Amino acid sequence: MHHDAIIIGGSFAGLSAATYLARGRRSVRVIDAGKPRNRFAEHSHGFFAQDGSNPLSMLETAKAQVEAYPTVTFTQGKAVSGSGEIDNFAIELDSSEIVEGRRLILAFGISDELPDIPGLAERWGNSVIHCPYCHGYEFSDRQLGVLNMSPMSVHQAMLISEWGSTTFFIDKGLEPDAEAFAELERRGVKIERSPVRALHGEGIDISEIELEDGRLVPLNALYIGPRNWLNSQIADTFGCAMDELPLGRTIQTDGLKTTTVPGIFAAGDITRGAHSVAWSVADGVTAGTAAHRSLVF
């Protein structure tokens, strides 16, 4: 079957795009690997009317609603290669199936490169976090930490200090300059130079951070700014232009989420440096409606 649109990725951006194309009565094939970025988090915050909801439950509900449209079909799998051009795209899946369509929406998301610190990975998305607007309120006025991972970490520490007492762990990163230290001090941010050895606490909670010099520092949340990578190389295969941001690559899009390749749209975390469920949904709506209109006009 030659679909009107192929969507690679069935998380918040992809499902939003599928919804609007389906409501435009277009045939849509959604290809999803089933590994959304925020699957590690127990709660999602800041999204209209869904504050505190479990992200996987949100996606399950959204998928069921999209599946109610007769023109949408879902395939569990991974897109491994692509070819063609506008009106004649072909995507090969890891099952060797070839899916064909007139338009292509990329919404396959990103993955995070976490520091190799014992106790960190299992707390990612819960007490090890990256976005204060998504998770910060729940840790208000508690013991907060920021791990120095990039030049942006100083800015992150300045911001996080708005939510509570903050310690900047220089760890093994580059030491900030005198001006940055002065600004951190002005904001009341404590500086800790000893490298981090491990995180400790019950379950997904943090109670303290262990340093290489043997000290245990009380802590309730650790903010990190991990590098990330695109979950698929499909955009490179088609020659979509990229932007190199401090924490990873993103696919270039215009205001309608159109890439530099005719007929290919992109949405969600793969197109922006700032990430949230709300932005991903908005991107998906924009890409879905733009793809639909390109089929009409």
Model-found features: residue ranges?
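N-terminal glycine-rich dinucleotide-binding loop that anchors FAD/FMN and/or NAD(P) in oxidoreductases
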Residues: 27, 33-35, 42-69, 130-131, ...
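FAD-binding core/adjacent interface of flavoenzyme oxidoreductases
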Residues: 1-5, 73-141, 221, 247-255, ...
